[in-house]
Amino acid sequence: MDFNFNLDLGLGTETKTTELSVNEIYESFIIGGGPAAMTAAVYLMRKGIKAAIVAGKIGGQVGDTKGIENYMGYNYIEGDELVSKFSNQVRQFEIAFKEYVFVENIHLEGDIKVIKLSDGFEYRSKTVIIAAGSKWRQLNVPGEEKLRGRGVCYCAICDGPFFKGLDIAVIGGGNS
C-alpha cells in the first residue's frame, strides 16, 4: 500500500497571479495591500478559496517605513524589502490581482457584493475583506514629505530607538 502525502500549495517560484475578471463571482474580495490583506490572501489561497485582491499599492505603510526592528523573524529589515517578500509570497498563488486602483463604491445585488473600482470596472464577490489599513496624519509642513523616513517619522514608540542620544521634537498629531 502506497501513500502520497504531497501537498501542492502552489509555492513554486513563478508568479501565478491572474487578472481580475468582470465575468467572475469571487468567493472573497480583499481590499487593501498591507500585511493584513496579504495575510488574508495567503490564507484564502491555501484553503483553495477563489479570491481577488485590489490595492492602491502593495505594502501599505510598511512600504514607507525605513527600518523595521520589531517584525518577528528579522532583526532588521527595510520596509520595501519586507513588502517585496509579501508580494512574492502572495504572487505564488493563483489569485486575481490588481494594483494602483481604489474602491469607489460597494453595493449589493441580492447576496452578491459589487465592488466598483477607480478604473471604472465592477467586480462581484460573495464576501469582502476590508483590510484598507490607515495612513499617517501629516502636519503639512515644508520638508515633511522629503524627510519622511530620514528624520520625520510617525510612530515615536516604533522609531524612538533610531534617535537615541539625538535632539528631537515630538509633535502630536491629535489622533491619540
Set out the residue ranges of the language-model regions:
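Glycine-rich beta-alpha-beta "Rossmann" dinucleotide-binding loop(s) and their flanking helix/strand
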Residues: D2-G12, D119-F121, V128, A132-C155
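Short, flexible, glycine/charge-rich loop motifs used to bind or transfer phosphoryl groups or to couple energy/partner
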Residues: T17-E19, Q61, N105, S118-D119, ...
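N-terminal Rossmann-like dinucleotide/flavin-binding domain of flavoprotein oxidoreductases
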Residues: D2-L9, G63-E122
